[in-house]
Design a protein with these regions (language model features):
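Juxtamembrane intracellular "pre-TM" segments in multi-pass secondary transporters
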Residues: 12-22, 200-232
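Conserved MFS/SLC helix-loop-helix module at the cytosolic interface between two early adjacent transmembrane helices
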Residues: 76-114
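Helix-to-loop junctions at the C-terminal end of transmembrane segments
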Residues: 78-89, 277-291, 388
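Structural signature of the two symmetry-related core transmembrane helices
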Residues: 93-106, 186, 293-308, 401
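Cytoplasmic helix-loop-helix junction between adjacent transmembrane helices
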Residues: 121-157
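Intracellular juxtamembrane helix-capping segments at the cytosolic ends
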Residues: 130-142, 344-358
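Helix-loop-helix hairpin linking two adjacent transmembrane segments in secondary transporters
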Residues: 146, 153-200
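C-terminal transmembrane helical hairpin of 12-TM major facilitator-type secondary transporters
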Residues: 293-346
Length: 414
C-alpha cells in the first residue's frame, strides 16, 4: 500500500515552525523502518490466533477476532484520527498517537481478560493509523521533484513489515510466548515515539478545516467517485480472501498430519511471502495499459490457489495429506505465495488508478482506498474464524474463494 504524499484526510498545506529539514538517505531508511514496525501491529496476530484463543479461552468461532479487530481499528483510525493532521500540529499528534498505541499493546500483553484484550488490540490498530500521518510528513521533507520516489522508498517498509510480521510474531511466540510479542511491540512503539519527537519538524496546518467538514468530504468522495468505488471494492474483496487464509492457517498447521510448532509456522509464513516479488511486475503492467488483464489474471491465480489449498488441507478431490505430507505442505506454501501475489497485484494496480484521479483530492482518495481495503481484511478474518468453527479448513477455503470470486466477477463486469 503506497499512499500518496499527501495526507489521507485531504491535500493539506502546512508550514514548518522549525527550520526546514531535508529527507536524507538515513532519515528515509528510518521512516521506512518505522512504518514497517508499526504495521506489524496489524498483521502479526494472524499466525497467533491459535495460541491467543487457547490462552484466553476464546471460542473457536471468535478466534478470528484477534486478527480482525486490529485491521478494523486501523480503518476507523484512518477516518477519525488521520484527518486531525489538518487541525492539529503534526509532530505532537504523531508522537501522542504512537504513545497511546504503545500503551494499548502493553495492555494486550498484560491482561487476562479476553474482552479487554480485544478492545486493546482494536485501539492499538486505530493508533497504528499513525502510518498515514508519517507518510505525508516524510514527503513534505523531500524536494518536490523527488517526492514520489521518497514516498515509494518510505512505503517499501510497509510491505516488508507486512511480510515479516507473521514469521516474526511466530518466532517470538514460539520462543517466549505470544504475550512477549505484544510486550516487545509496545516497547518498540514507545521508543519510536521518542525518536520521532527528536527527528520530526514541527508542522502546523496553514488552513485548518473544521473536523465535521473533513469527515463529510470523505463520504462525498466515496459516494461520487466510481473509480474509487470499483478499485476499493476489489481490493477489499481480495483482502478478505487473503485474510481468511492467513487468519486460520496456523489453526490448521498445528493439526495432524502437519503438527507444526510456532517456529514451523514462522518458516511457512516466510516462504509464503515470496509472492510479493510480483510488485514491480504489476506496476509495469499498469504502465503498459494491461491493468484489467493483469487484475483478472491475479484474481484467477488466487482462485486456483484456494482450490489447491483446499485439496492440500481439507482433502478435496480425495487427496490425503497424511499419505503425502510433503506434497501437501508444498501445495500450501505455493498457494500462500499465489495469494500474496494476487493481493499485491490488485493493490498495486488499484493504487495506480487512484493516483491518476483528481490530484487535489488524492490524499483523501488514498485514505479511503486503504480504509475500505482494511475493512475487507477485517471481514475476511472474522468470517474465517466462524467458518473454521463450523466447517473446519473446508469452510475457510470456501470463504476465501467466495471473496475472491466476487472480486473476479466485479472486474469482469466493470
Amino acid at each position: 500500500m503506497i499512499p500518496s504524499a499527501e495526507s489521507p484526510a485531504r491535500a493539506i498545506a502546512t508550514q514548518d515552525a522549525d527550520s526546514p529539514r531535508r529527507l536524507t538517505g538515513p532519515l528515509t531508511v528510518f521512516f521506512a523502518t518505522a512504518v514497517g514496525v508499526i504495521v506489524m501491529n496489524l498483521f502479526a496476530a494472524q499466525t497467533l490466533t491459535g495460541a491467543i484463543s487457547r490462552s484466553l479461552h476464546l471460542a473457536p468461532e471468535f478466534a478470528g477476532l484477534a486478527a480482525m479487530l486490529p485491521q478494523l481499528g486501523y480503518a476507523v483510525g484512518l477516518v477519525l484520527l488521520v484527518p486531525l493532521c489538518d487541525l492539529l500540529e503534526n509532530r505532537r499528534l504523531i508522537v501522542r498517537t504512537l504513545v497511546l498505541g504503545a500503551g494499548f499493546l502493553a495492555i494486550a500483553m498484560l491482561t487476562q481478560s479476553r474482552v479487554l484484550f480485544l478492545i486493546a488490540v482494536f485501539l492499538a490498530g486505530a493508533a497504528s493509523s499513525v502510518i498515514q500521518m508519517l507518510v505525508p510528513m516524510a514527503a513534505s521533507m523531500a524536494p518536490e521533484s523527488h517526492r514520489g520516489r521518497a514516498v515509494g522508498n518510505v512505503m517499501s517498509g510497509l510491505m516488508l513489515g507486512i511480510l515479516l510480521s507473521r514469521p516474526a510474531a511466530s518466532l517470538i511466540a514460539g520462543s517466549v510466548g505470544w504475550r512477549a510479542f505484544y510486550g516487545l511491540a509496545a516497547v518498540i512503539n514507545a521508543l519510536l515515539a521518542i525518536v520521532l519527537y527528536v527527528k520530526l519538524p514541527v508542522r502546523m496546518p496553514l488552513n485548518p478545516t473544521r473536523y465535521p467538514a473533513l469527515l463529510y468530504s470523505l463520504w462525498t468522495l466515496l459516494r461520487t467517485e466510481p473509480v474509487l468505488q470499483r478499485n476499493a471494492a476489489s481490493a477489499a474483496l481480495v483482502m478478505g480472501g487473503f485474510s481468511a487464509f492467513w487468519t486460520a492457517i496456523s489453526l490448521r498447521l498445528v493439526q495432524p498430519p502437519f503438527s507444526f510448532d510456532m517456529k514451523g509456522i514462522a518458516l511457512f509464513a516466510l516462504a509464503g511471502a515470496a509472492g510479493a516479488v510480483v510488485t514491480p511486475l504489476a506496476g509495469r503492467a499498469g504502465d503498459r495499459g494491461w491493468d484489467r488483464k493483469s487484475l483478472l489474471a491475479g484474481h484467477l491465480t488466487m482462485l486456483i490457489a484456494l482450490v489447491a489449498i483446499g485439496v492440500a488441507g481439507a482433502g478435496w478431490g480425495g487427496f490425503s495429506a497424511s499419505a503425502h505430507p510433503v506434497l501437501a505442505v508444498a501445495m500450501l506454501v505455493a498457494g500462500a505465495a499465489a495469494l500474496d501475489a494476487g493481493v499485491v497485484t490488485d493493490q498495486t494496480l488499484g493504487r495506480r488508478a487512484i493516483n491518476l484521479m483528481d490530484a487535489a483530492a488524492r490524499g483523501r482518495l488514498n485514505g479511503l482506498f486503504v480504509g475500505v481495503f482494511f475493512v475487507g481484511g477485517a471481514s475476511g478474518a472474522a468470517m474465517s474464524g466462524a467458518a473454521w468453527a463450523i466447517a473446519g479448513w473446508s469452510g475457510v477455503c470456501v470463504v476465501g474463494f467466495v471473496f475472491t470470486a466476487l472480486a473476479f466477477v466485479l472486474r469482469l463486469i466493470r
